[in-house]
């Protein structure tokens, strides 16, 4: 048995198991999410999108969260029933992670991926971790069938180009990052090697070091890049094609999403489940999955803080919806004055 840093008895409060699989085959690709209350809606649609394009595939889903309400219970059970799949909810105590670096956009939930990786040690040879703002639009059969060589810890997708990798390698003080700096929203993890390299324990230790904290800008992601350089398999960009819906506010931009894209990763503060961003062409993969899920009649989310009001106003004005745009700017300024 391999050693685990995050012990179940320390972080796991309870498990809810929505098991509606028809077959009794136990072998499956475990797909896991770590999310807080704000991303559960997106997480549900992410799962629906994978199931929509991979019906009949051997998949099991796992959601690690510190909140799960009555409506969430209803919808996720209905999703598992609709697609005859299994979705397990792990209600966790994240207090141990709250002291780690965070921002207004990245809460302590970004560290749930370490809990997830440790949970599957000795339980599954590999686990696919996905951010909840990733939507599938193709088959993931190659990931289901993939086998790791013994010396690699994870399959990842790089972001940026070689000059960016060089800058990150210099900033973070790890030469190996120059071969490729990756985004941590897609991680196919070799659990045996993750344990052997003591990734979670080393990552948390680094995140408590003042000298490391000074260097990092993307806490979990930077630390993983520092630890896993030279221990990675780089996958095609189609498995983590990043796009910010706020690019739509620019006069011109390049949309990297193509028909070959498997996973669209909606980075940035504006998400396709926001009611000011659903009608862009690049958001339609999300909307199609939503319409093929128990959330099909659920309203999209309205802005609920000053940052969202500001972006909502910008998008409304870009679409020439001036009344809505100016009214949201007014609400934005009111919120700023209040706080």
Swiss-Prot record:
Binding, Mg(2+): 131, 133, 265
Catalytic activity, EC: 2.4.1.73
Keyword Magnesium: yes
Reaction catalysed by this enzyme: UDP-glucose + lipopolysaccharide = UDP + alpha-D-glucosyl-lipopolysaccharide; alpha-D-Gal-(1->6)-alpha-D-Glc-(1->3)-[L-alpha-D-Hep-(1->7)]-4-O-PO3(2-)-L-alpha-D-Hep-(1->3)-4-O-PO3(2-)-L-alpha-D-Hep-(1->5)-[alpha-Kdo-(2->4)]-alpha-Kdo-(2->6)-lipid A + UDP-alpha-D-glucose = alpha-D-Glc-(1->3)-[alpha-D-Gal-(1->6)]-alpha-D-Glc-(1->3)-[L-alpha-D-Hep-(1->7)]-4-O-PO3(2-)-L-alpha-D-Hep-(1->3)-4-O-PO3(2-)-L-alpha-D-Hep-(1->5)-[alpha-Kdo-(2->4)]-alpha-Kdo-(2->6)-lipid A + UDP + H(+)
Impact after mutating residue 239 to A: Does not affect transferase activity. Can complement a deletion mutant
CDD domains: GT8_A4GalT_like
Disruption phenotype: LPS of the mutant contains one galactose and one glucose unit.
Pathway, per record: Bacterial outer membrane biogenesis; LPS core biosynthesis
Any Pfam family hit: Glyco_transf_8C
Sequence motif DXD 2, location on chain: 220-222
Residues annotated for UDP binding in this entry: 34-39, 131-132, 265-271
Cofactor requirements of the protein: Mg(2+)
Keywords: Glycosyltransferase, Lipopolysaccharide biosynthesis, Magnesium, Metal-binding, Transferase
Record's function text: Glucosyltransferase involved in the biosynthesis of the core oligosaccharide region of lipopolysaccharide (LPS). Catalyzes the addition of a second glucose (glucose II) to the first outer-core glucose (glucose I). In vitro, can add multiple glucose residues to its lipid acceptor. Activity does not require the branched galactose added by WaaB, but it is higher in the presence of this branched galactose. In the absence of a lipid acceptor, can hydrolyze UDP-glucose, but not UDP-galactose.
Protein family according to the UniProt entry: Belongs to the glycosyltransferase 8 family.
NCBIfam families xrefs: PRK15171.1
Free-text note regarding domains: Contains two DXD motifs that may play a crucial role in the catalytic function.
The protein's name: Lipopolysaccharide glucosyltransferase WaaO
Source species of the chain: Escherichia coli (strain K12)
Organism ancestry: Bacteria, Pseudomonadati, Pseudomonadota, Gammaproteobacteria, Enterobacterales
């Amino acid at each position: 048995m391999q050693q685990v840093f995050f012990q179940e008895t320390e972080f796991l409060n309870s498990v809810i198991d929505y098991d509606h699989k028809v077959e009794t085959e136990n072998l499956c690709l475990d797909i896991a999410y770590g999310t807080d209350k704000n991303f559960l809606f997106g997480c549900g649609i992410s799962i629906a999108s994978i199931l929509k394009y991979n019906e009949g595939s051997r998949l099991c889903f796992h959601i690690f969260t510190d909140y799960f309400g009555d409506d969430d219970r209803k919808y996720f059970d209905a999703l598992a029933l609709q697609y005859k799949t299994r979705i397990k909810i792990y209600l966790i105590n994240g207090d141990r992670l709250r002291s780690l670096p965070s921002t207004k956009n990245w809460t302590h939930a970004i560290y749930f991926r370490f809990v997830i990786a440790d949970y599957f040690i000795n339980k599954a040879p590999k686990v696919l971790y996905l951010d909840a703002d990733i939507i599938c639009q193709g088959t993931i059969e190659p990931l289901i069938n993939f086998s790791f060589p013994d010396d690699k810890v994870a399959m990842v997708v790089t972001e940026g180009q070689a000059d960016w990798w060089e800058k990150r390698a210099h900033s973070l003080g790890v030469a190996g990052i120059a071969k490729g700096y990756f985004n941590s929203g897609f991680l196919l993890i070799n659990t045996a090697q993750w344990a052997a390299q003591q990734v979670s324990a080393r990552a948390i230790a680094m995140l408590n070091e003042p000298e490391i904290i000074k260097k990092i800008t993307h806490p979990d992601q930077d630390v993983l890049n520092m630890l896993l350089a030279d221990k990675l398999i780089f996958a095609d960009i189609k498995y983590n094609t990043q796009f910010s819906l706020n690019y739509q506010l620019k006069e011109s931009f390049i949309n990297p999403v193509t028909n070959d894209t498997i996973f669209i990763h909606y980075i940035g503060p504006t998400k396709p489940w926001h009611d000011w961003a659903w009608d862009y062409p690049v958001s339609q993969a999300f909307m199609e999955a939503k319409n093929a899920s128990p959330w099909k009649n659920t309203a999209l989310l309205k802005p609920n803080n000053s940052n969202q009001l500001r972006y909502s106003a910008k998008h409304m004005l870009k679409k020439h919806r001036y009344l809505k745009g100016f009214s949201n700017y007014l609400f934005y300024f009111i919120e700023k004055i209040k706080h």
